[in-house]
Structure formats: C-alpha cells, structure tokens
C-alpha cells in the first residue's frame, strides 16, 4: 500500500512539473515574440527618420524618395567615379547617385525597379562590370533586409534568389534589422 501511494503521488508531481514546464516555455516564447515585434516596430519607425544619414539612409532614400530626372546606379565603382555635379552640369538635369559600396546587380535591380514603380526618370546610368553579375558576397540582399516586408521588389528578389531558410528567418523583425544596427 505504501508503494501504491508513492506511485500515485509521483504521477501528480510529474503532471505539475510538466504543466509548470509547459507554462514556462509558453511565457518565454511569448516574451521573445513580443520583444521581437516591439523592436521591429521601433526600427520601422526609426528607419525613415534616418533617411538622410549614411549608407542605410541612402538605401531608404533610393527605394522610396529619390525623384530626380537622372539616377546613377551601381556598386562602389559608380559610387566613387560618377561625380553628381559634373553629370548635372554636362546633361543639364538634376541627378542623384544611388550607388552603394558592396551592392551589386541583385541589390541594384531592386532599387531600379522601386524607382521605376514610383516615376520614370529621363535617364538611368547603370554601371555594371562582369564581376557585378556574379558577385562574390554570400548574401547580396543583406542591406535590403529591413525592407523585406515593405518593398515588393525586395521581397520577390529575396524569395527568388535566397534559400528558403534565409527568408524564413526574415519573419523575425530583429533579424531584418541586424544588418543596420
């Protein structure tokens, strides 16, 4: 009889322990989701505020705000070798250089498609080299992750070119902004 009460007592303890474990796991996972969502919403709010600062601001401006008649697109070669003022003086139209160091064909095609969706520039100067088509970087879209949910061209390119596990990770807002922070 003593053995029997021990067995029934251990089942009760086991059920309570399993319930406690389940509740703890649920609370931890819920906390992670809430923190991820809160940080993501904060970063979504902050990104347009820095649209005039640094490389991240330049990318945001390129995707959403640029509206000059002449747009210069490319990687670091276009970024450093095209002087916007000289292009404006020789063509007689305002120009903006959206080229960014380390951003090659896949990145630039998202930028150009976003620009063409908003308006039709009179001239797009697109600097490409052979090595830009076969970029050696592991992830050509890392600078575009923050725009995964908000830009249809970025979303389509990431889903088309990257493995499924990479864009599955982009469901996390913190992961999207990891390249920016």
Go through each PLM region and give its residues.
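Alpha-helical transmembrane signal-anchor/signal-peptide segments
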Residues: 41-61, 66
